[in-house]
Regions:
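HhH-family (HhH-GPD) DNA N-glycosylase catalytic core used in base-excision repair
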Residues: 1-202
Length: 202
């Protein structure tokens, strides 16, 4: 069963908030709120790729550095990065200096541009993979789902990299394609209401 923790303000939150003090603000203002902005969706899927094998705390601490280094995750600008940019980024101590992940982000920016041409927007594409409610497991008991596997497979077929099913599931949790706030978390009902009123892109 997923659990909650009670913060100093008396509010019950998802238990993972207890792992680091900075997680509370991220949890309360970002995680699980539905996102239909292409740039934010692209940023998140890139950062989830960088997180692979690391902790989200590490990535969150470096997020502003990533934004500065990667053209604020404007995928149209990032798609134009070349080998000189890769070498520059490999010298940037403010980010995760992993050549494969850096090159994957640039590659994915190019794929994102192609996707917008075909689909109209990244949001229209990603929200097509919003799971049916019957598929949703008990909150925070899974690290993948049939939909995250399907989305991962489709992204890879389109040439995206560092988009395995676990990475994609974390992306879906964070971007509000599912409401994975724990039962008892003070935000779970609020997220449900936001999701009900959301006009899905497409």
């Amino acid at each position: 069963m997923s659990k909650t923790v009670t913060g100093p303000d008396g509010k019950c939150r998802c238990a993972w908030c207890d792992a680091a003090p900075e997680f509370n603000a991220y949890h309360d203002t970002e995680w699980g709120f539905p996102v239909i902005d292409d740039q934010r969706l692209f940023e998140k899927i890139c950062l989830e790729g960088f997180q692979s094998g690391l902790s989200w705390r590490t990535i969150l601490a470096k997020r502003e550095n990533f934004r500065a280094a990667f053209a604020d995750f404007d995928f149209r600008k990032l798609a134009k990065f070349d080998e000189k940019d890769v070498e520059r980024l490999l010298q940037d101590a403010g980010i995760i200096r992993h050549r494969g992940k850096i090159e994957a982000s640039i590659n994915n920016a190019k794929r994102a541009c192609e996707m917008v041409e075909r689909e109209g927007s990244l949001a229209a594409y990603f929200w097509r993979f919003e799971p049916d409610p019957s598929e949703i497991a008990i909150p925070q008991t899974k690290s993948t789902s049939p939909t995250s596997v399907a989305l991962s497979k489709d992204l890879k077929k389109r040439g995206w990299k560092f988009v395995g099913p676990t990475t994609v599931f974390a992306f879906m949790q964070a971007m509000g394609l599912i409401n994975d706030h724990a039962e008892g978390c003070f935000l779970r009902p609020k997220i449900d209401e936001v999701r009900k009123s959301l006009v899905r892109p497409g």
